[in-house]
Amino acid sequence: MLTKLLKISCTSRQCTFAKPYQAIPGPRGPFGMGNLYNYLPGIGSYSWLRLHQAGQDKYEKYGAIVRETIVPGQDIVWLYDPKDIALLLNERDCPQRRSHLALAQYRKSRPDVYKTTGLLPTNGPEWWRIRAQVQKELSAPKSVRNFVRQVDGVTKEFIRFLQESRNGGAIDMLPKLTRLNLELTCLLTFGARLQSFTAQEQDPRSRSTRLMDAAETTNSCILPTDQGLQLWRFLETPSFRKLSQAQSYMESVALELVEENVRNGSVGSSLISAYVKNPELDRSDVVGTAADLLLAGIDTTSYASAFLLYHIARNPEVQQKLHEEARRVLPSAKDELSMDALRTDITYTRAVLKESLRLNPIAVGVGRILNQDAIFSGYFVPKGTTVVTQNMVACRLEQHFQDPLRFQPDRWLQHRSALNPYLVLPFGHGMRACIARRLAEQNMHILLLRLLREYELIWSGSDDEMGVKTLLINKPDAPVLIDLRLRRE
């Protein structure tokens, strides 16, 4: 109700009494020429690779709403207050965002492959046309549960792969988790196994390794090409060249796997088999969606899983509770994991994942382009403005969470009703929330149950807190070194 009243207020005479947009505090750069210089290596105090630190600094200097001029004519309004975040994300129209601009340009240059720029960059009715069709197979709880057996089978294979990788010492988990999520993404999307755990596929020239590299390269190029002067619109900059080369390879694999699926008569329960049969989607829609799922499905869940295992390994009491829950769900490690158990019997596992995503979300926040004028923290913000939430910073503030830097899953079991629902939004919110959220969560739940059922996780990395690199999505900035010790029954 409050959100509705706030929205109405901006279209009424009350909007007149809001403080002007120009009065929002924040960095404008020397002579109003923009703050881009402050992100340049060796010159500025900020970094595109440390956006969370820049966000914390701006909050401390300017408060809960910040207007930053990147270059003249290109502003970002940053929001830290959950009331403002709720107002932004409870949209009535098709949500718009300003992201993946260079990816959109690459796809526009390939009209023989793509009819649209895909789910990630596209806005408006065309975005909704695609989203409405592809989300049926990805968002419905029943559809997601249909993948449990496949995911569980690959996860058990992954744990055997970890056993073979131990060699008596700690394992850097992130590269291993990336292979797991690549394998799961290709299996669920295309119904295809890449055999990513084999020695052959661990070769740097293999398809698996090249796909992993291409996904990370693409994601690392998004922020630098989205912001600033965008010279790539006029000439081939190094970042645009890297993105294009990476996307060209991912596109070739997506085309190959889609065609293979079609040749096989679209058999099985893969996502692409359903999309190929959908009369509302043509071949270019299917290929674009396949490329999007490859790009979005590999690194996001891998990085989130790496932070998750890091927190568990550093918190033995949490780990013991997880092990006990895993034993209740899987009395024997050889038992099948049931869909009913995942739905009703893993309360603590869910809390652990949520707490990890509070401290280390997939991204620093959620971006939107305003569809209408709005008021945030008493300031007028006009339609068309780029607004980005700062959930990662907000989730580490004492006014929102008691002892905010402590990893404490029990907070989600004991005081959940008192916690603002617009603070922890790792998958976004509303119509434009992550289309594969339920599937990603289910995959991570299965990984936790299987791994903690058999192994104790011992942290072998630095005693310092794990840092973050913001490659569009948040990545651990150091090896996630964990020693796996087989539990005795």
Swiss-Prot record:
Pfam families: p450. Its main location: mitochondrion. Its cofactor is heme. It catalyses: 2,22-dideoxyecdysone + 2 reduced [adrenodoxin] + O2 + 2 H(+) = 2-deoxyecdysone + 2 oxidized [adrenodoxin] + H2O. CDD domains: CYP24A1-like. Heme binds at residue 434. Complex coexpression pattern of dib (disembodied) and sad (shade) in the early embryo that restricts to the prothoracic gland cells of the developing ring gland during late embryogenesis. In larvae and adult, coexpression is seen in prothoracic gland and follicle cells of the ovary. In adults, coexpression is seen in the follicle cells. One of its GO terms (cellular component) is mitochondrion. Required for CNS development; negatively regulates glial cell division in the embryonic midline. Involved in the metabolism of insect hormones; responsible for ecdysteroid C22-hydroxylase activity. May be involved in the breakdown of synthetic insecticides. This is Cytochrome P450 302a1, mitochondrial. It comes from Drosophila melanogaster.
